[in-house]
Amino acid sequence: MAVGKNKGLSKGGKKGGKKKVVDPFSRKDWYDVKAPNMFQTRQIGKTLVNRTQGQRIASDYLKGRVFEVSLADLQKDIDPERSFRKFRLIAEDVQDRNVLCNFHGMDLTTDKYRSMVKKWQTLIEAIVEAKTVDGYLLRVFCIGFTFKDQQSQRKTCYAQQSQVRKIRARMTDIITNEVSGADLKQLVNKLALDSIAKDIEKSCQRIYPLHDVYIRKVKVLKKPRFDISKLLELHGDGGGKTTEAVVSAEGAVIDRPEGYEPPVQEAV
Protein backbone atom coordinates (compact mmCIF):
# COMPACT_ATOMS: atom_id res chain seq x y z
CA MET A 1 0.00 0.00 0.00
CA ALA A 2 1.41 3.36 -1.01
CA VAL A 3 1.92 5.88 1.77
CA GLY A 4 1.09 9.49 0.91
CA LYS A 5 -1.26 12.37 1.35
CA ASN A 6 -4.97 11.97 0.66
CA LYS A 7 -5.75 14.87 -1.66
CA GLY A 8 -9.48 14.63 -1.00
CA LEU A 9 -9.08 14.99 2.77
CA SER A 10 -6.52 17.76 2.55
CA LYS A 11 -8.84 19.91 0.42
CA GLY A 12 -11.79 19.52 2.73
CA GLY A 13 -13.71 16.72 1.01
CA LYS A 14 -15.77 16.99 -2.16
CA LYS A 15 -16.25 20.26 -3.96
CA GLY A 16 -19.16 22.31 -2.69
CA GLY A 17 -19.58 20.42 0.54
CA LYS A 18 -23.02 19.82 2.02
CA LYS A 19 -25.82 21.83 0.43
CA LYS A 20 -28.48 23.47 2.56
CA VAL A 21 -31.85 21.76 2.15
CA VAL A 22 -34.64 24.25 1.42
CA ASP A 23 -38.27 23.25 1.80
CA PRO A 24 -39.93 23.97 -1.61
CA PHE A 25 -43.29 24.61 0.09
CA SER A 26 -41.83 27.60 1.94
CA ARG A 27 -41.89 29.52 -1.37
CA LYS A 28 -45.53 28.66 -2.17
CA ASP A 29 -48.92 30.08 -1.22
CA TRP A 30 -52.38 28.52 -1.05
CA TYR A 31 -55.22 29.99 -3.12
CA ASP A 32 -58.94 29.22 -2.79
CA VAL A 33 -60.61 27.90 -5.96
CA LYS A 34 -64.09 29.41 -6.48
CA ALA A 35 -66.82 27.92 -8.68
CA PRO A 36 -69.48 30.13 -10.39
CA ASN A 37 -72.72 30.85 -8.53
CA MET A 38 -74.64 28.40 -10.75
CA PHE A 39 -73.36 25.68 -8.38
CA GLN A 40 -74.23 25.31 -4.70
CA THR A 41 -70.65 24.64 -3.59
CA ARG A 42 -68.67 27.83 -4.19
CA GLN A 43 -65.29 26.81 -2.79
CA ILE A 44 -64.23 23.56 -4.48
CA GLY A 45 -60.70 23.33 -3.12
CA LYS A 46 -57.29 24.95 -2.85
CA THR A 47 -54.31 25.16 -5.19
CA LEU A 48 -50.61 25.90 -4.73
CA VAL A 49 -48.44 28.36 -6.61
CA ASN A 50 -45.03 29.97 -6.13
CA ARG A 51 -45.05 33.45 -4.61
CA THR A 52 -44.56 36.51 -6.78
CA GLN A 53 -40.84 37.12 -7.26
CA GLY A 54 -39.65 39.84 -9.59
CA GLN A 55 -41.26 39.38 -13.00
CA ARG A 56 -42.72 35.99 -12.07
CA ILE A 57 -46.24 36.94 -11.03
CA ALA A 58 -48.20 34.25 -9.19
CA SER A 59 -51.54 35.06 -10.86
CA ASP A 60 -50.07 34.42 -14.32
CA TYR A 61 -49.28 30.85 -13.30
CA LEU A 62 -52.77 30.33 -11.86
CA LYS A 63 -54.72 31.48 -14.92
CA GLY A 64 -55.50 28.61 -17.26
CA ARG A 65 -55.46 25.86 -14.65
CA VAL A 66 -58.28 23.34 -15.14
CA PHE A 67 -60.04 21.69 -12.20
CA GLU A 68 -62.24 18.59 -12.62
CA VAL A 69 -65.01 18.26 -10.04
CA SER A 70 -67.89 15.81 -9.66
CA LEU A 71 -71.37 17.27 -10.03
CA ALA A 72 -72.40 15.63 -6.75
CA ASP A 73 -69.71 17.65 -4.94
CA LEU A 74 -70.67 20.85 -6.74
CA GLN A 75 -74.37 20.49 -5.86
CA LYS A 76 -73.95 18.92 -2.38
CA ASP A 77 -76.09 16.00 -3.51
CA ILE A 78 -75.63 12.26 -2.96
CA ASP A 79 -77.92 11.37 -5.86
CA PRO A 80 -76.15 8.63 -7.89
CA GLU A 81 -77.42 10.29 -11.09
CA ARG A 82 -75.09 13.22 -10.38
CA SER A 83 -71.99 11.41 -9.16
CA PHE A 84 -70.86 10.15 -12.58
CA ARG A 85 -70.86 13.61 -14.20
CA LYS A 86 -67.61 15.56 -14.11
CA PHE A 87 -67.50 19.29 -14.73
CA ARG A 88 -64.29 21.01 -15.79
CA LEU A 89 -63.69 24.54 -14.51
CA ILE A 90 -60.90 26.79 -15.79
CA ALA A 91 -59.24 29.58 -13.79
CA GLU A 92 -59.80 32.88 -15.60
CA ASP A 93 -58.90 35.53 -13.04
CA VAL A 94 -57.40 35.96 -9.57
CA GLN A 95 -58.87 38.35 -6.99
CA ASP A 96 -56.94 38.63 -3.74
CA ARG A 97 -56.39 34.98 -2.69
CA ASN A 98 -59.33 33.63 -4.71
CA VAL A 99 -59.14 31.94 -8.11
CA LEU A 100 -62.32 32.67 -10.11
CA CYS A 101 -63.30 29.82 -12.42
CA ASN A 102 -65.65 29.42 -15.36
CA PHE A 103 -67.20 26.44 -17.15
CA HIS A 104 -64.72 24.62 -19.40
CA GLY A 105 -66.43 21.31 -20.25
CA MET A 106 -68.27 18.24 -19.02
CA ASP A 107 -67.70 14.50 -19.24
CA LEU A 108 -68.96 11.19 -17.89
CA THR A 109 -66.80 8.93 -15.76
CA THR A 110 -65.14 6.03 -17.54
CA ASP A 111 -66.88 3.35 -15.47
CA LYS A 112 -70.33 4.79 -16.22
CA TYR A 113 -69.62 5.07 -19.95
CA ARG A 114 -68.33 1.50 -20.20
CA SER A 115 -71.16 0.05 -18.12
CA MET A 116 -73.75 1.31 -20.63
CA VAL A 117 -72.25 -0.47 -23.66
CA LYS A 118 -73.84 -3.95 -23.90
CA LYS A 119 -74.68 -6.61 -26.43
CA TRP A 120 -77.94 -7.04 -28.36
CA GLN A 121 -78.64 -3.31 -28.68
CA THR A 122 -77.78 -0.47 -31.05
CA LEU A 123 -75.57 2.41 -29.96
CA ILE A 124 -76.56 5.77 -31.46
CA GLU A 125 -74.27 8.77 -31.11
CA ALA A 126 -74.49 12.35 -32.38
CA ILE A 127 -71.82 15.07 -32.38
CA VAL A 128 -73.06 18.65 -32.69
CA GLU A 129 -71.27 22.00 -32.81
CA ALA A 130 -73.35 25.00 -31.76
CA LYS A 131 -72.83 28.50 -30.39
CA THR A 132 -74.53 29.94 -27.32
CA VAL A 133 -76.16 33.36 -27.16
CA ASP A 134 -73.11 34.86 -25.41
CA GLY A 135 -70.65 33.56 -28.02
CA TYR A 136 -69.31 30.23 -26.68
CA LEU A 137 -68.73 27.65 -29.42
CA LEU A 138 -69.36 24.16 -27.99
CA ARG A 139 -69.04 20.64 -29.29
CA VAL A 140 -71.67 18.39 -27.70
CA PHE A 141 -71.53 14.59 -27.75
CA CYS A 142 -74.81 12.73 -27.21
CA ILE A 143 -75.22 8.98 -26.77
CA GLY A 144 -78.22 6.67 -26.56
CA PHE A 145 -79.11 2.97 -26.78
CA THR A 146 -82.11 1.14 -28.16
CA PHE A 147 -84.45 -0.35 -25.59
CA LYS A 148 -85.99 -3.82 -25.72
CA ASP A 149 -89.75 -4.01 -25.43
CA GLN A 150 -90.83 -6.16 -22.48
CA GLN A 151 -93.51 -7.88 -24.56
CA SER A 152 -91.10 -8.79 -27.34
CA GLN A 153 -89.85 -12.38 -27.56
CA ARG A 154 -86.73 -11.41 -29.47
CA LYS A 155 -83.35 -11.48 -27.80
CA THR A 156 -82.06 -8.42 -29.62
CA CYS A 157 -83.33 -4.87 -30.09
CA TYR A 158 -81.40 -3.68 -33.11
CA ALA A 159 -82.65 -0.58 -34.95
CA GLN A 160 -82.63 -0.24 -38.72
CA GLN A 161 -80.22 2.20 -40.35
CA SER A 162 -83.09 4.44 -41.45
CA GLN A 163 -84.27 4.64 -37.82
CA VAL A 164 -80.73 5.38 -36.62
CA ARG A 165 -80.45 8.27 -39.09
CA LYS A 166 -83.80 9.70 -37.97
CA ILE A 167 -82.84 9.46 -34.30
CA ARG A 168 -79.45 11.07 -34.95
CA ALA A 169 -81.13 13.90 -36.88
CA ARG A 170 -83.59 14.41 -34.01
CA MET A 171 -80.69 14.51 -31.52
CA THR A 172 -78.89 17.11 -33.63
CA ASP A 173 -81.96 19.35 -33.93
CA ILE A 174 -82.76 19.28 -30.20
CA ILE A 175 -79.16 19.95 -29.12
CA THR A 176 -78.76 22.78 -31.63
CA ASN A 177 -81.97 24.47 -30.48
CA GLU A 178 -81.14 24.08 -26.78
CA VAL A 179 -77.58 25.41 -27.11
CA SER A 180 -78.25 28.26 -29.54
CA GLY A 181 -81.21 29.51 -27.49
CA ALA A 182 -79.42 29.83 -24.15
CA ASP A 183 -76.39 31.53 -22.65
CA LEU A 184 -73.61 29.61 -20.90
CA LYS A 185 -75.16 29.85 -17.43
CA GLN A 186 -78.53 28.53 -18.61
CA LEU A 187 -76.84 25.74 -20.56
CA VAL A 188 -74.84 24.60 -17.52
CA ASN A 189 -78.07 24.41 -15.52
CA LYS A 190 -79.59 22.24 -18.27
CA LEU A 191 -76.56 19.95 -18.24
CA ALA A 192 -76.72 19.64 -14.45
CA LEU A 193 -80.41 18.69 -14.58
CA ASP A 194 -79.90 16.50 -17.69
CA SER A 195 -82.98 18.07 -19.27
CA ILE A 196 -81.61 17.93 -22.84
CA ALA A 197 -81.10 14.16 -22.73
CA LYS A 198 -84.59 13.65 -21.28
CA ASP A 199 -86.12 15.69 -24.11
CA ILE A 200 -84.23 13.59 -26.67
CA GLU A 201 -85.38 10.32 -25.10
CA LYS A 202 -89.00 11.49 -25.02
CA SER A 203 -88.92 12.82 -28.59
CA CYS A 204 -87.41 9.64 -30.09
CA GLN A 205 -89.89 7.19 -28.55
CA ARG A 206 -92.05 7.20 -31.69
CA ILE A 207 -89.09 6.29 -33.90
CA TYR A 208 -87.58 3.62 -31.62
CA PRO A 209 -87.64 3.30 -27.79
CA LEU A 210 -84.37 4.49 -26.22
CA HIS A 211 -82.77 4.28 -22.80
CA ASP A 212 -79.52 5.50 -21.22
CA VAL A 213 -79.62 8.72 -23.24
CA TYR A 214 -76.97 11.14 -21.96
CA ILE A 215 -74.98 14.16 -22.98
CA ARG A 216 -71.71 12.27 -22.84
CA LYS A 217 -69.25 15.13 -23.28
CA VAL A 218 -69.15 18.88 -23.82
CA LYS A 219 -66.06 20.67 -25.16
CA VAL A 220 -65.52 24.42 -25.27
CA LEU A 221 -63.96 25.10 -28.68
CA LYS A 222 -63.96 28.90 -28.73
CA LYS A 223 -64.69 31.62 -26.17
CA PRO A 224 -65.59 35.29 -26.55
CA ARG A 225 -63.11 37.96 -25.53
CA PHE A 226 -62.46 37.89 -21.79
CA ASP A 227 -64.57 40.36 -19.80
CA ILE A 228 -63.91 40.69 -16.08
CA SER A 229 -67.36 42.19 -15.42
CA LYS A 230 -69.11 39.12 -16.87
CA LEU A 231 -66.91 36.81 -14.82
CA LEU A 232 -67.71 38.73 -11.63
CA GLU A 233 -71.39 38.56 -12.56
CA LEU A 234 -71.09 34.75 -12.73
CA HIS A 235 -69.59 34.85 -9.25
CA GLY A 236 -72.37 36.96 -7.75
CA ASP A 237 -71.57 40.55 -8.73
CA GLY A 238 -73.93 42.67 -10.81
CA GLY A 239 -71.10 43.75 -13.08
CA GLY A 240 -71.31 47.42 -12.13
CA LYS A 241 -67.70 47.58 -11.01
CA THR A 242 -64.74 45.88 -12.61
CA THR A 243 -61.39 45.71 -10.88
CA GLU A 244 -62.64 47.13 -7.55
CA ALA A 245 -64.73 44.01 -6.81
CA VAL A 246 -63.00 41.47 -4.59
CA VAL A 247 -64.24 38.02 -3.59
CA SER A 248 -64.13 37.24 0.11
CA ALA A 249 -63.17 33.89 1.64
CA GLU A 250 -66.86 32.90 1.91
CA GLY A 251 -67.36 33.45 -1.83
CA ALA A 252 -69.23 36.78 -1.58
CA VAL A 253 -68.13 39.70 -3.75
CA ILE A 254 -67.13 42.88 -1.87
CA ASP A 255 -67.59 46.17 -3.72
CA ARG A 256 -64.94 48.83 -3.16
CA PRO A 257 -65.19 52.46 -4.31
CA GLU A 258 -63.02 53.70 -7.15
CA GLY A 259 -59.56 54.82 -6.09
CA TYR A 260 -59.64 52.61 -3.00
CA GLU A 261 -56.24 51.95 -1.48
CA PRO A 262 -55.59 49.61 1.45
CA PRO A 263 -54.44 51.31 4.68
CA VAL A 264 -50.72 51.44 5.34
CA GLN A 265 -49.65 49.00 8.02
CA GLU A 266 -47.33 50.38 10.68
CA ALA A 267 -45.80 46.99 11.42
CA VAL A 268 -45.40 43.90 9.29
UniProtKB/Swiss-Prot annotation:
Keywords: Cytoplasm, Developmental protein, Differentiation, Oogenesis, Ribonucleoprotein, Ribosomal protein. It comes from the Eukaryota. GO terms for molecular function: structural constituent of ribosome. GO terms for cellular component: cytosolic small ribosomal subunit. GO terms for biological process: oogenesis; translation. InterPro entries: Ribosomal_eS1 (IPR001593), Ribosomal_eS1_CS (IPR018281), Ribosomal_eS1_euk (IPR027500). The keyword Transmembrane helix does not apply. It is found in: Cytoplasm. Pfam families: Ribosomal_S3Ae. Its main location: cytoplasm. Transmembrane segments: none annotated. The keyword Acyltransferase does not apply. Residues 1-21 are annotated as: Disordered. Essential for oogenesis; required for late follicle cell development. Component of the small ribosomal subunit. Mature ribosomes consist of a small (40S) and a large (60S) subunit. The 40S subunit contains about 33 different proteins and 1 molecule of RNA (18S). The 60S subunit contains about 49 different proteins and 3 molecules of RNA (28S, 5.8S and 5S). Belongs to the eukaryotic ribosomal protein eS1 family. This is Small ribosomal subunit protein eS1. It comes from Drosophila mojavensis.
